[in-house]
Amino acid sequence: MIDRGSEVRILREESYWFNEVGTVATVDQSGIRYPAVVRFEKVNYSGTNTNNFALSELVEVSSPKKKDK
């Protein structure tokens, strides 16, 4: 299950970050086409380090780390 804090690999071939790993910042539950906002370490040509992706374009590499309370 892709959730906030998950490390994901990008499968969208036309993306600058294709096959790169990023961290999910948020996942929108309202039913929009590209609900997952993914943040990356490196920036693209326009200086952006975030992008929206569909859940079908992402593969979870590692799940979010649980906080100890």
Swiss-Prot record:
UniProt organism field: Phaeodactylum tricornutum (strain CCAP 1055/1)
Pfam short name (any one): PSI_PsaE
GO biological processes: photosynthesis
Alphabetic keyword roster: Chloroplast, Membrane, Photosynthesis, Photosystem I, Plastid, Thylakoid
GO CC terms, sorted: chloroplast thylakoid membrane; photosystem I reaction center
Similarity remark: Belongs to the PsaE family.
PANTHER family noted in UniProt: PHOTOSYSTEM I REACTION CENTER SUBUNIT IV A, CHLOROPLASTIC-RELATED, PHOTOSYSTEM I SUBUNIT IV
Domain of life of the source: Eukaryota
Localization, UniProt: Plastid, Chloroplast thylakoid membrane
Gene it is expressed from: psaE
HAMAP family to which the protein is assigned, alphabetical: PSI_PsaE
Main function: Stabilizes the interaction between PsaC and the PSI core, assists the docking of the ferredoxin to PSI and interacts with ferredoxin-NADP oxidoreductase.
Membrane topology note: Peripheral membrane protein
The protein's name: Photosystem I reaction center subunit IV
